[in-house]
């Protein structure tokens, strides 16, 4: 694993972060708890200081402001969170064991990271599989329920066969699978992908934007599955690292995300902005992510991620 050097001025600073998150949450009207945030920063201090940190928000007013660290070294986030009282024993024994199971694949190579809600604290664990891995490996890992396994052939029929990340949402009891989808995207492909979540095809405007910004070689596509029922709640298409807005227009974002773009600071030498179009049933929304500190772009390039610029 190549570890990127990060200059001292660009590293995580807790006081600065607490000031930044308070301003940002107020700007986008997102709930915020300083005490919960301080607890999170204490429990995962090493990961925030040594890893990469980013922001995430949606275009829906009142939605959470999220932040995430990507660890640069293997850690056991489930044990750390459990020991600190951030996860209940029931969550650890069910959803937590999925995280641990996936992390143990490939002789323990996968790396865990976490998502946090500015008000609620820890909400999600990520597992980077350290490469593009066969879907069958992911779904045959110990403890993976039939509710997830049942979709294997359907995914393969859509040529969704390689997984780079998985994520487990502790709050919503869902699992995300992040695939490399074959590009360039077509309307037929998007229609078939959306149908997984019971959604109609993207609008013409949405599709043209997706076609413009999703990498033509291949792009990140995610499905969100309820662990109990196996229902696919939504799908998402990720345009990672948008071009500099001064040189090329971004996809259309609403006033809520314009506020986020205005107030979310980034201290990385090369800023990373990303949008994701999400579809589930009749619901559609847009997510926006921005690098905060720790040098996100070199990290995701090291993963072999296809980018928009």
Curated annotation (Swiss-Prot):
Q: Which InterPro entries match?
A: Aro_prenylTrfase, Prenyltransferase_CloQ, PrenylTrfase-like_sf
- Which Pfam families does the record cross-reference, listed alphabetically? PTase_Orf2
What is the main EC category here? transferase
Keywords in alphabetical order: Prenyltransferase, Transferase
Q: What would be an example GO MF term here?
A: prenyltransferase activity
- Claim: Cell membrane is one of the keywords in the record: no
Q: Does the keyword Transferase apply?
A: yes
For this protein, the Enzyme Commission number is: 2.5.1.-
Q: What does this protein do?
A: Prenyltransferase that attaches isoprenoid moieties to carbon atoms of aromatic substrates in an enzyme-catalyzed Friedel-Crafts reaction. Shows specificity for dimethylallyl diphosphate (DMAPP) and does not accept geranyl diphosphate (GPP) or isopentenyl diphosphate (IPP). Prenylates the artificial substrate 2,7-dihydroxynaphthalene (2,7-DHN), as well as dihydrophenazine-1-carboxylic acid and 4-hydroxybenzoic acid at lower levels.
The UniProt family comment states:
Belongs to the aromatic prenyltransferase family.
Other remarks in the entry: The gene is not located within a recognizable secondary metabolic gene cluster.
Protein known as: Aromatic prenyltransferase
Q: Which organism is it from?
A: Botryotinia fuckeliana (strain B05.10) (Noble rot fungus)
């Amino acid at each position: 694993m190549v570890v990127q050097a990060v200059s001292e001025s660009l590293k995580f600073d807790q006081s600065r972060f607490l000031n930044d998150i308070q301003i940002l949450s107020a700007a986008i009207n997102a709930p915020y708890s300083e005490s919960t945030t301080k607890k999170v920063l204490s429990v995962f201090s090493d990961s925030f200081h040594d890893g990469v940190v980013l922001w995430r928000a949606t275009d829906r007013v009142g939605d959470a402001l999220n932040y995430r660290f990507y660890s640069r070294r293997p850690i056991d986030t489930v044990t750390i969170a459990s020991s600190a009282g951030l996860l209940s024993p029931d969550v650890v024994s069910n959803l937590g064991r999925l995280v641990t199971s996936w992390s143990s694949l490939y002789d323990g190579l996968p790396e865990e990271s976490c998502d946090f809600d500015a008000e609620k604290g820890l909400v999600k664990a990520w597992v980077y599989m350290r490469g593009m891995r066969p879907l069958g490996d992911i779904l045959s890992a110990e403890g993976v329920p039939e509710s997830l396994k049942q979709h294997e052939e359907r995914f393969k029929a859509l040529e969704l066969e390689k997984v780079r990340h998985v994520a487990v949402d502790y709050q919503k009891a869902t699992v995300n699978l992040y695939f490399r989808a074959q590009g360039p995207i077509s309307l037929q492909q998007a229609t078939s992908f959306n149908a997984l979540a019971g959604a109609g095809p993207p609008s013409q405007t949405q599709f043209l934007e997706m076609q413009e910004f999703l990498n033509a070689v291949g792009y990140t596509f995610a499905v969100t599955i309820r662990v109990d029922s196996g229902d696919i709640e939504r799908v998402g298409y990720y345009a990672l690292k948008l071009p500099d807005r001064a040189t090329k227009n971004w996809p259309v974002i609403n006033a809520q995300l314009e506020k986020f773009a205005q107030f979310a600071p980034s201290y990385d030498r090369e800023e990373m902005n990303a949008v994701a179009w999400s579809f589930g049933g009749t619901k559609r929304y847009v997510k926006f992510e921005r690098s905060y500190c720790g040098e996100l772009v070199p990290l995701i390039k090291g993963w072999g991620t296809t980018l928009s610029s």
